[in-house]
């Protein structure tokens, strides 16, 4: 949004459509709405090989009449590259055991050029689907580019159905599940405790922070010079931290955003993301592996309580560094008018 104010920028955003649990997929698309609202001019997808997911991404833009161009990230996937990404657990990349078996067999049989055939086919399929272009990754050497160009020319006159048939043959796809991860579940409901917690905190937020009376009383209390006193300010901050940390994971950010995040604190995201998820989740799990992604929890809860528009529309500002370590209660009431 800041770049838009300066002008001269063509702003691109990343998007990962290769999500297979309902909540993490919903969270990705809800954030894409926000990115477009914030001023995205074009979209670049994560690297991936599931053409159905790319079709869904393009269909989403068409359905919502978004004019932004979308580009697909593509890569000639060799066994070495696939093994590297698996070894280093590159976040957000889906490479299935079936894909590894196909690549291993091709290497054994001396058919490694199939990686460039598939890349050429994927580029041409994306063109048929209405993608504006591709981001070609890991194809740097002139001989690699010439090989890719050779197969693009070879398949250029194929129709979409012919390309899809050849793609499926090269990946040995028979059930359409070969290029997607195995799911322990697709959809989950929020727990009763999550629903009760949301309802209680929502009631408290409305009563204590959004009602006209609360705003007036809060503004009157916190405009007093008392709170400029260091001991009083420290006591206030400590009181706020104790009351919120155990319930929502407060980290004294100074600019509480709970009302815009369904009372799931963005400070509990390892990356501190408030507007939605990164692209690195795997089946609802955070890329750090120690927790469920809070944005999946949030998307699941939003659907259950009819609040998906909040996650779709509300652009949450970054917390200024100078605000951190101050009382969000005081900052809230002084920034609002009764």
In which residue ranges do the predicted regions lie?
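Catalytic beta/alpha-barrel core
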Residues: 41-50, 135-137
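Charge-patterned, long linear interaction tracts outside catalytic cores
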Residues: 124-147
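Active-site glycine- and acidic-residue-rich loops that bind
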Residues: 45-58, 81, 142-145
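Active-site pocket-lining/capping segments in soluble small-molecule metabolic enzymes
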Residues: 1-22, 59-122, 140-142, 149-186
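Ferredoxin-type iron-sulfur electron-transfer modules and their immediate structural context
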Residues: 176-338
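Conserved, mostly hydrophobic/aromatic
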Residues: 35, 39, 72, 134, ...
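Active-site glycine-rich loop that binds ribose-phosphate moieties when present
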Residues: 22-38
């Amino acid at each position: 949004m800041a770049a838009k104010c300066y002008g001269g920028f063509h702003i691109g955003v990343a998007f990962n459509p290769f999500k297979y649990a309902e909540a993490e997929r919903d969270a990705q698309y809800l954030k894409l709405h926000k990115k477009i609202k914030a001023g995205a001019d074009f979209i670049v997808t994560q690297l991936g090989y599931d053409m159905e997911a790319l079709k869904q991404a393009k269909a989403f833009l068409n359905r919502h009449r978004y004019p932004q161009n979308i580009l697909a990230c593509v890569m000639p996937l060799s066994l070495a590259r696939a093994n590297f990404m698996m070894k280093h657990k590159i976040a957000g990349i889906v490479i299935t055991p079936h894909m590894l078996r196909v690549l291993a067999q091709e290497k054994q049989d001396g058919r490694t050029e199939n990686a460039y055939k598939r890349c050429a086919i994927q580029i041409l399929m994306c063109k048929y689907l209405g993608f504006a272009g591709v981001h070609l990754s890991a194809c740097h050497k002139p001989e690699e580019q010439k090989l890719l160009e050779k197969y693009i020319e070879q398949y250029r006159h194929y129709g979409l159905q012919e390309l899809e048939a050849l793609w499926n043959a090269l990946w040995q796809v028979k059930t359409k599940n070969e290029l997607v991860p195995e799911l322990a579940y697709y959809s989950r409901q929020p727990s009763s405790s999550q629903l009760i917690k949301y309802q209680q905190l929502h009631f408290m937020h409305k009563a204590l922070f959004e009602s006209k009376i609360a705003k007036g009383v809060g503004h009157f209390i916190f405009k007093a010079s008392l709170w400029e006193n260091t001991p009083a300010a420290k006591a206030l901050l400590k009181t706020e931290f104790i009351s919120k940390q155990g319930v929502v994971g407060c980290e004294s950010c100074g600019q509480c955003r709970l009302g815009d995040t369904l009372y799931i604190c963005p400070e509990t995201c390892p990356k501190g993301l408030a507007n939605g998820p990164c692209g690195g989740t795997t089946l609802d799990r955070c890329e750090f592996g120690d927790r469920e992604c809070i944005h999946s929890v949030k998307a699941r809860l939003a659907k259950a309580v009819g609040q998906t528009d909040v996650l779709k529309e509300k652009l949450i500002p970054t917390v200024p560094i100078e605000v951190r370590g101050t009382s969000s209660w005081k900052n809230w009431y002084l920034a609002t008018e009764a």
